[in-house]
């Protein structure tokens, strides 16, 4: 759908002499032309044209060999600039090969004839990599030479090759003969691999008899189009080593011109077709088989002088005696994009590096034409953004309004036929007029929203074209149009015309000449902006018709640019031919394939298959371009598109972007950023209905209707409801509500910074909206929108199912005809079984019956079920319904209200463990509450809560049960106190105290056992023993001294303290020995690991773990599907069992810490940690023991114990803590996991008794 737009049509100054050939110096961007070899000048003159268009003579020379013996002057067969020797190579028809130095040293000759080819040169051509030189001699031989002119091969062009290689077979793919047309269609029996007519290779009447050579773009093959004996034309293909690869099949009317597509797919030549009196471009594959064609739309006898592909293989130039046609292709259709008038028999040449630069060489001048392939579409605003795209195809203009219909090319919505080949086209700013022109005529068409295109008029512009070359066309506002032309001396001029429909005349509104070359123009708000060849922008005010001074420019000239109005300023956006996108002087992105501007965005596609959006702001520096990884963050300003996609048009009113794929087809997408922008615009305008429809169409979260502006929404609830109006739309909105604010996440407004975004937080948002909308619907649309009202109940959190059912109950009582619809709607929103249960919970059997009728329940089941309830008395019915619904607490309440049902009440309470509820129901009936409390106490004791049971028993006067419960709970104080209060039996009290003392000793509660012996058993000796065992030495001393029995103090207490001292000393010694042995072993292990870590790791094999068992985790985390979650066995479950088994084995090895394994160090370190914990645990006990020893005059033992224990704690600080500060090398760290930072315990010094030595 692209058109060829001319940026530059420059005529170089005249060269003195007749130009014979042209060559390009891509290194310094210079051009060399050869003149002479005619009657006026039999010698050779070479001129150099610099990049600044300065013409200077490079060299002039002559040689006797340039003129033959019979007086004929030699001809140039090829001219090539060679980069490595920095020389021009000329091959002459007489056989001379001349090398001309472009920058010779003083001692070098500027030119040299390096050799002569015997029998002359018929054709010659250098390969594109300048490494191989191919020559066809007059002796029917083909020579392949290196760049140093060493012969690679010399082969005779034998006619026998035609017979040997003329065995082309086509299997007929794609032909009608090979297509299946139905089994009943009788087809003529024939071989589909053979054509119906076999060409003999008859020569065209306009064949010039010349031989052409053309290399493939990668220089691996060369093709030769020459006359063979017969005579017929044949294309031979040779490898760069000189081996014949193929010969083309014969074609009637084939001409001599030849051009190999640089991409290498096909060879192009021209054929005169007498069957339809036309000329065609036909294509051959490298193997010589035909591969497509297209008509040149010319007569059979038309003479063609040139055929050339541009370097990018996108344009095919075909020249006749007085014009050059430029063809492009897309979707298997060939478009005639431009036809340029040229001097008689001029030569055409494409620049070898600049793909869209064409040189036309006349007799004594050179024209340079620079094109750009671009979509003809202009910056337009809503609602005039129809996406009107005109496509030039010869004398036809193919027009498609993409907003109304997306028709892939080459098809179109309108085909406008003109009397001339269209050179340029444009649409105006409001997309209601279309213009087409060549260099003499301008035609205008009108377009309206009813999809009609009518001819407005045709106007003569030839009177303005004298000395100018019209190159581009730009529609302005209304029926105004701008024509841009290039003149001589690298200057430009523009005309602004107004088309008059009445007299079909043009009114010149403005005109201006520029001394510099203008590449292209843009129109914006009655301002014209022109870009010079240096990238500078010039503005022209159409209102005052004068040039205004502006400081806008691009760093480099842009092949396409547009000026966008943003907040009363102008922002120029331009794209260079090298894919660099600029906003004035700022580089926005590189690798850009296409761009488009709307009122709010700059859109562009990149070579990384991304479509990006940039919010337009008035300051260029504030334009934010997201990085490529933004697509992974789901940023709305970046999205993935198909590879090679280019933007054709963007239509903000449709929120659409039309992309064209490399193969030519169109695709319309709706980017989220444009859709959201449209939704926000609708919300601001209170067009909630339109915003809702957009969200519904593009599957946006409907919460944005509220979250974007909650205050605006809450103030305009009637507007919102009236905008949606339809019940199903309101239902959809209500069911889509959720508590989250979508504008803070996926739908955040990226045009604002985080500080600019104000987020209004609404607590309980869903319930609030449901309530407000329900209130409005109830007051205004209660009779028609009952369905939406029900939805509002069910969408609250939690759902108000009972309220909705209550509403339906009201409809039933009112005998409304909408009851069935309401119930059906509820069954759609909520599980019908749940609704049935809730209806039962309301004790409304009629409502439950109606709901059951909407379900899949069997009437033979639910009808008797409901009938059974219907027969029961009201309280019994409610009780049974609550039991069915497992609402046991409610059922218990109904049971309490029944008469003579207290026993059933107690049994029901016991059955369902409803003791707290039962106590609450009878909180004002003390007798009943007492009975409930007794059964509750029984339950508590049976479930291991004897302490609570004992309290309950005691509160209701069940003393014996309370005593037993207290004993079970070990609460000796409560047990003995209640026993002393209720009985005078000393024996019973003593027996109970003995039992309790024994229980305390079993539970290692020695202090409690001592208290019982002292207070209730009058056994001070046992009390002293138990107090010492409980480390309560001070209490033991007090009891011993209080008895007044010296034997208890001297014999028993001293003896028990001695035992405690011995146990403590033994424990401290064990600590010391463990610290010594384990710290030494850890240091040894760490030293070995440092010296030989591999051997340390191999220590894991000492336990003879089988080789096929991995100790590392191999568990897989997979999500179960709906089907696999119910299977009995699977590979993953087996693997889980195996892995769990390995993990348990690994933990057992870790716990053992076997010597020599990788687990040993970890085991020893953990053992030291446990030792420190044990030392800290007994620290207060040792301190109390020291005090007791001193008080009993056992200072020697106290000093010894204090010294040893203090030494242990000191050793821990000196030796153990440094070891614990180093991360432990566990089995996991050996497998590559990161070690965890160690937790070092804080061990304080032991607080000694200062009175001890």
From Swiss-Prot:
Gene Ontology terms for molecular function: tRNA binding
Entry keyword set: Cytoplasm, tRNA processing
Residue segments, region Mediates dimerization: 830-1253
Region of interest (Disordered), residue spans: 1126-1153
Listed GO biological process terms: regulation of cytoplasmic translational fidelity; tRNA wobble base 5-methoxycarbonylmethyl-2-thiouridinylation
Span list, region Required for binding to tRNA: 1137-1155
Top-level division of the source organism's lineage: Eukaryota
One term under GO cellular component: chromatin
Annotated metabolic or biological route of this protein: tRNA modification; 5-methoxycarbonylmethyl-2-thiouridine-tRNA biosynthesis
Subunit structure: Homodimer. Component of the elongator complex.
Family to which this protein belongs: Belongs to the ELP1/IKA1 family.
Protein name per the record: Elongator complex protein 1
Taxonomic path: Eukaryota, Fungi, Dikarya, Ascomycota, Taphrinomycotina
Gene designation per UniProt: elp1
């Amino acid at each position: 759908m692209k058109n060829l737009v001319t940026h530059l049509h420059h005529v170089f100054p005249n060269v003195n002499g007749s130009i014979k050939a042209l060559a390009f110096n891509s290194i310094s961007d210079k051009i060399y032309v050869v003149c002479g070899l005619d009657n006026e000048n039999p010698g050779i003159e070479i001129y150099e044209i610099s990049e600044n268009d300065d013409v200077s003579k490079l060299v002039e020379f002559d040689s006797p060999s340039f003129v033959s013996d019979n007086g004929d002057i030699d001809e140039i067969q090829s001219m090539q600039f060679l980069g490595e020797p920095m020389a021009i190579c000329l091959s002459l028809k007489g056989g001379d090969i001349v090398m001309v130095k472009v920058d010779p040293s003083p001692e070098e000759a500027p030119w040299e004839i390096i050799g002569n080819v015997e029998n002359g040169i018929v054709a010659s051509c250098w390969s594109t990599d300048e490494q191989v030189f191919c020559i066809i001699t007059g002796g029917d031989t083909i020579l392949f030479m290196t760049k140093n002119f060493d012969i690679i091969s010399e082969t005779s062009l034998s006619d026998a090759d035609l017979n040997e290689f003329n065995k082309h077979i086509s299997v007929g793919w794609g032909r009608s003969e090979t297509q299946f047309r139905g089994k009943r269609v009788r087809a003529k029996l024939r071989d589909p691999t053979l054509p119906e007519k076999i060409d003999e290779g008859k020569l065209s009447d306009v064949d010039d008899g010349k031989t052409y050579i053309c290399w493939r773009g990668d220089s691996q093959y060369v093709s030769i189009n020459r006359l063979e004996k017969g005579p017929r034309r044949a294309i031979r293909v040779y490898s760069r080593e000189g081996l014949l690869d193929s010969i083309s099949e014969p074609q009637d009317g084939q001409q001599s011109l030849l051009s190999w597509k640089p991409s290498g797919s096909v060879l192009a030549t021209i054929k005169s077709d007498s069957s339809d009196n036309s000329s065609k471009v036909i294509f051959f594959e490298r193997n010589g088989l035909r591969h497509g064609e297209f008509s040149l739309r010319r007569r059979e006898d038309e003479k063609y002088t040139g055929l050339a592909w541009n370097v990018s293989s996108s344009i095919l130039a075909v020249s006749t005696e007085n014009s050059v046609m430029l063809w492009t292709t897309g979707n298997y259709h060939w478009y005639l994009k431009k036809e340029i008038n040229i001097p008689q028999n001029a030569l055409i040449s494409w620049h070898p590096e600049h793909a869209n630069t064409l040189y036309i060489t006349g007799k004594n001048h050179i024209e340079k034409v620079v094109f750009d392939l671009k979509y003809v579409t202009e910056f337009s605003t809503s609602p005039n953004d129809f996406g009107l795209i005109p496509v030039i195809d010869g004398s036809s203009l193919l027009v498609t309004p993409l907003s109304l219909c997306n028709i892939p090319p080459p098809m179109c919505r309108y085909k406008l036929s003109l009397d001339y080949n269209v050179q340029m086209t444009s649409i105006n700013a409001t997309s209601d007029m279309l213009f087409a022109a060549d260099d003499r005529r301008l035609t205008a068409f009108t377009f309206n929203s009813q999809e009609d295109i009518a001819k407005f008029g045709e106007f003569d512009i030839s009177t303005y074209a004298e000395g100018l070359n019209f190159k581009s066309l730009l529609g302005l506002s209304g029926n105004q149009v701008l024509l841009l032309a290039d003149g001589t001396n690298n200057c430009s001029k523009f005309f602004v015309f107004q088309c008059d429909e009445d007299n079909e005349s043009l009114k010149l509104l403005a005109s201006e000449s520029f001394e510099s070359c203008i590449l292209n123009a843009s129109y914006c708000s009655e301002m014209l902006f022109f870009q010079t060849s240096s990238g500078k922008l010039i503005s022209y005010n159409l209102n005052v018709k004068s040039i205004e001074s502006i400081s806008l420019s691009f760093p480099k000239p842009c092949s396409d640019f547009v000026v966008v109005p943003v907040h009363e300023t102008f922002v120029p956006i331009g794209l260079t031919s090298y894919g660099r996108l600029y906003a004035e002087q700022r580089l926005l992105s590189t690798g850009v394939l296409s761009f488009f501007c709307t009122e709010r965005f700059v859109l562009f596609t990149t070579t990384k298959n991304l479509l990006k959006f940039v919010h337009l702001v008035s300051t260029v520096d504030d334009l934010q371009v997201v990085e490529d990884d933004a697509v992974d963050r789901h940023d709305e300003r970046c999205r993935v598109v198909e590879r090679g996609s280019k933007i054709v048009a963007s239509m903000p009113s449709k929120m659409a972007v039309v992309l064209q794929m490399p193969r030519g087809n169109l695709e319309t997408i709706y980017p989220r950023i444009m859709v959201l922008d449209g939704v926000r615009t609708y919300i601001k305008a209170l067009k909630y209905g339109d915003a809702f429809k957009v969200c519904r169409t593009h599957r946006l979260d409907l919460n944005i209707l509220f979250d974007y502006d909650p205050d605006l929404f809450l103030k305009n609830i009637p507007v919102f409801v009236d905008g949606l109006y339809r019940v199903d739309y309101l239902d959809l909105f209500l069911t889509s509500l959720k508590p989250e604010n979508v504008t803070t996440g996926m739908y955040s407004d990226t045009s604002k910074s985080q500080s600019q975004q104000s987020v209004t937080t609404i607590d309980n948002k869903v319930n609030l909206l449901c309530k407000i909308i329900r209130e409005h619907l109830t007051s205004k649309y209660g009779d028609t929108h009952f369905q939406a009202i029900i939805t509002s109940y069910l969408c609250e959190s939690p759902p108000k199912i009972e309220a909705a059912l209550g509403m339906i109950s009201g409809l039933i009582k009112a005998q409304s005809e909408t009851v069935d619809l309401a119930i059906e709607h509820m069954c759609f929103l909520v599980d019908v079984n749940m609704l049935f249960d809730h209806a039962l919970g309301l004790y409304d059997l009629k409502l439950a019956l109606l709901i059951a009728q909407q379900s899949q329940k069997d009437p033979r089941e639910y009808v008797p079920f409901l009938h059974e309830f219907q027969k029961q008395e009201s309280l019994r019915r409610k009780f049974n319904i609550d039991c069915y619904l497992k609402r046991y607490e409610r059922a218990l309440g109904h049971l309490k209200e029944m008469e003579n049902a207290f026993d059933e009440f107690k049994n029901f309470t016991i059955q369902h463990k409803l003791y707290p509820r039962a106590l609450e129901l009878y909180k004002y009936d003390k007798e009943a509450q007492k009975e409930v409390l007794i059964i509750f106490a029984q339950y508590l004791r049976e479930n291991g809560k004897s302490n609570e049971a004992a309290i309950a028993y005691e509160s209701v006067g069940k003393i014996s049960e309370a005593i037993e419960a207290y004993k079970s709970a070990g609460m000796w104080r409560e047990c003995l106190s209640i026993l002393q209060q209720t009985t005078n039996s000393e024996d019973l009290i003593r027996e109970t105290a003995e039992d309790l003392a024994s229980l305390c000793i079993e539970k290692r509660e020695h202090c409690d056992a001592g208290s019982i012996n002292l207070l209730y058993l009058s056994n001070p000796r046992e009390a002293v023993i138990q107090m010492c065992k409980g480390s309560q030495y001070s209490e033991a001393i007090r009891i011993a001294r209080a008895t007044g029995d010296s034997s208890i103090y001297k014999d028993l207490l001293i003896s028990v303290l001695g035992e405690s001292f011995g146990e403590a000393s033994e424990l401290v010694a064990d600590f010391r020995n463990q610290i010594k042995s384990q710290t030494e072993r850890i240091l040894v292990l760490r030293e070995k690991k440092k010296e030989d870590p591999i051997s340390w790791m191999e220590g894991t094999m000492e336990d003879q773990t089988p080789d096929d068992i991995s100790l590392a985790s191999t568990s897989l985390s997979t999500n179960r599907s709906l089907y696999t979650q119910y299977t009995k066995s699977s590979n993953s479950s087996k693997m889980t069992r195996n892995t769990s088994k390995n993990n348990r084995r690994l933990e057992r090895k870790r716990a053992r810490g076997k010597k020599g394994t990788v687990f040993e160090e970890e085991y020893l370190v953990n053992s030291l940690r446990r030792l420190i914990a044990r030392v800290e645990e007994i620290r207060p006990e040792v301190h109390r023991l020291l005090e007791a020893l001193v008080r009993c005059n056992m200072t020697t033992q106290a000093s010894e114990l204090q010294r040893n224990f203090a030494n242990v704690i000191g050793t821990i600080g000196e030796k153990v803590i440094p070891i614990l500060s180093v991360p432990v090398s566990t089995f996991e760290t050996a497998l590559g996991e990161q070690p965890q930072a160690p937790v070092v315990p804080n061990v304080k010094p032991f607080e000694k008794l200062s009175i001890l030595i």
